[in-house]
From Swiss-Prot:
Membrane topology, record value: Multi-pass membrane protein
Official protein name in the record: Lipoteichoic acid synthase
Transmembrane stretches, start-end: 8-28, 44-64, 69-89, 120-140, 154-174
Domain of life assignment: Bacteria
Species in which this protein is naturally found: Staphylococcus aureus (strain MW2)
Family per similarity comment: Belongs to the LTA synthase family.
Chain's gene name: ltaS
């Protein structure tokens, strides 16, 4: 490269950087992101959508000259690559994309080290090959660079071409997916049609809009939501209303549990024999097999939030992290004010995770038994926290000392991605799909099942079982779409988008003192739990703002919204813009008569719930049946075993 003609000009370096970033992004679409790409138009959009913003950003550096212009171009390209790779790793773990809201959850990463490290793949070097080559040239082969300035009069042309390409991209996107930016809640749609870089810009704009919404909110906004939710309220079932008044309420959170495990056998052995028994209808528990999680990016925290508030989580980020200082009318506070319940949460992790130590105060939760109340010695810990069997045993001992009535929420941890378990704790062989995540899930789910059985037996021994309402539920899916190939081997069937929606069943079991069990096939979600519990306790709900309906009410609403705008009814499901029959998961070509009504209801539910959170609307509510929670009243002391970790 001794001649001037063979040197790399700044514009050539610009083109190389744009092309390699575009190719890496296209690679990620097919290797790491599950975007459901079909047809020539969508593939063309995938090739087009990274280019516009990447070229626009990097073209700014064409105004510079000399070596620093190359360095600025390199740094800009590296930052875009880093954004792409950060999304790749995040998607592998959460099946979603990074937003400005999720940056508020970065403090959780330290506590999830093992799970995060499992998200790295051997081929990840592909994302940085070009970066290393460019860095080598900039440091060791500067003589290859033509440092003459690029003609500034052509820079606006490059920028204009980038903007024009963006609008062409948007036109294709709107043709293939109408009202993309105004109606969709699903980040996968946005990334598929706009690319991860334009999505980041879009998310930034939405974040600013949401922050402004609180400042502009008024009592009129609250009135609109109240009028909407009151139209949806259902009458309680007289056979169940008040039957659990002042009974203890125990809520058991099964981490990452999905009900495809119920009655599932691996190598001839039942994966969850105890839960199978509870699901039979012959025990005192009523089992809801068509109960779905409704979480978004907040995952576990979203499930807690939805079940204790009958609100949906946020479309971006976690309500715990972003709206933890809002005013709420939560289930624990209502139970306290109406019937004198004392509430607690028990969890084998530290209290700052998911901002729990702050948000629980706004829920009116009296006590938080975090990791400092348990022996966190290395032998007792696996993956993200305390082993479930030890957690349940110690928690039952704490509960035995409580004064009735209490509302107690237990959050398990062992059945958490990446589903690792000490060999001595494994009592079933892994499945043999070849996918470490799916195969490990079988073992950790069995361990969770055994831990739950030991806990229920412990409650009986301690005299707590008969006088308690006991709820059991899965918080969110454990196996994401990234593992569909392995799931097909495990289940012996094709995992289509419709089937994956079916797999979002996480189950709900409830034991009510004085009532026999059974199987209830109503379609329901986590948003329905709060009104159910209030009615069981004999509390009139007409003045409470809730989006769910009582599971035992004859008027229970069987339309189950998902956070991305999809939904399922007792007859069909709406997934990725298509309608499928629940009977056989086949595509329905004739639109059901109630489809538009249900779709509008789902969109309105999510919109109204978002308005409540973004506007902090409960601060305006003068509810005659509720006194606003004063969070300063609550303080969560460090437990007696704070120094047990070794």
């Amino acid at each position: 490269m001794s001649s001037q003609k063979k040197k790399i000009s700044l514009f050539a370096f610009f083109l190389l950087t744009v092309i390699t970033i575009t190719l890496k992004t296209y690679f990620s679409y097919y290797v790491d992101f599950s975007l459901g790409v079909k047809g020539l138009v969508q593939n063309l959009i995938l090739l087009m959508n990274p280019y516009s913003l990447v070229a626009l950003v990097l073209s700014v550096f064409l105004f510079f000259k000399g070596k620093k212009a190359f360095w600025f171009m390199f740094i800009g390209g590296f930052l875009l690559t880093f954004l792409l790779y950060a999304n790749v790793v995040y998607f592998r773990f959460f099946s979603d994309f990074l937003t400005f809201s999720t940056l508020n959850q970065v403090g959780n990463v330290e506590s999830m080290g093992g799970a995060v490290s499992a998200s790295f793949k051997w081929y990840d070097f592909v994302y940085f090959i070009d970066t290393l080559v460019y860095l080598f040239i900039l440091i060791f082969k500067t003589k290859w660079l033509d440092t003459k300035a690029f003609s500034k009069k052509f820079v606006p042309v490059v920028m204009a071409a980038s903007v024009a390409l963006f609008f062409l991209n948007l036109a294709f996107a709107e043709t293939d997916r109408p009202e993309l930016l105004t109606r969709t809640f699903d980040h996968k749609y946005l990334v598929k049609y706009l690319g991860p870089y334009n999505f980041t810009v879009y998310d930034g704009v939405k974040t600013i809009e949401n922050n402004q919404q609180k400042a502009l909110a008024s009592e009129d906004d609250l009135t609109k939501v109240l009028n909407y939710t009151k139209q949806r309220q259902t009458e309680p079932n007289p056979e169940y209303y008040g039957v659990a008044k002042k009974k203890n309420i125990i809520k058991i959170h099964l981490e990452s549990f999905q009900t495809f495990l119920i009655n599932k056998k691996v190598n001839g052995k039942e994966v969850t024999p105890f839960l199978n028994k509870l699901s039979s209808g012959k025990e005192q528990f009523t089992y809801f097999p068509n109960f779905f999680h409704q979480t978004g990016q907040g995952k576990t925290s979203d499930s807690e939030f939805t079940m204790d508030n009958s609100l949906y989580g946020l479309p971006q980020g976690s309500a715990f992290s972003l709206k933890g200082d809002n005013t709420y009318q939560s289930l624990p506070a209502i139970l306290d004010q109406k019937q004198g319940y004392k509430s607690d949460v028990m969890h084998g992790d530290y209290k700052t995770f998911w901002n729990r130590d702050q948000v629980y105060k706004h829920f009116g939760i009296d006590k938080f038994y975090d990791a400092t109340y348990y022996d966190m010695s290395d032998k007792n810990v696996v993956n993200l926290g305390l082993k479930d069997k030890i957690f349940f045993k110690d928690s039952a001992n704490y509960q035995a000392k409580m004064k009735s009535p209490f509302y107690s929420h237990l959050i398990t941890l062992t059945n958490h991605y990446p589903f690792t378990l000490d060999e001595k704790d494994a009592t079933i062989e892994k499945s043999n799909t070849g996918d470490a995540t799916v195969d490990g899930y079988i073992q950790t789910a069995r361990y969770l099942d055994e831990a739950l059985e030991e806990y229920i037996n412990d409650l009986k021994k301690k005299g707590l079982y008969d006088n308690s309402v006991i709820m059991i539920y899965g918080d969110h899916y454990g196996i994401s779409e990234n593992h569909n190939n392995a799931m097909e081997k495990l289940l012996g069937e094709k995992i289509t988008p419709a089937k994956f929606t079916d797999l979002n069943r996480t189950g709900f079991w409830i034991k009510i003192p004085g009532k026999s069990g059974g199987i209830n096939n109503e379609y329901a979600g986590q948003v329905d739990v709060m009104p159910t519990i209030l009615h069981l306790a004999g509390i009139d709900t007409k003045n409470y703002l809730m989006f769910g309906t009582d599971l035992f009410s004859k008027g229970h609403n069987q339309v189950v919204p998902f956070r991305n705008g999809d939904f399922i009814t007792k007859d069909y499901k709406y997934v990725n813009g298509k309608i499928y029959s629940n009977k056989n998961n086949e595509l329905i070509t004739t639109q059901p008569a109630d489809f538009e009504k249900n779709k509008k209801q789902v969109e309105k539910d999510l919109e109204m719930s978002d308005n409540v959170l973004n506007g902090d609307l409960f601060r305006f509510y003068k509810n005659p049946d509720f006194k606003k929670v004063n969070p300063s009243k609550y303080k969560y002391e460090t437990g007696p075993k704070a120094n047990s970790k070794k």
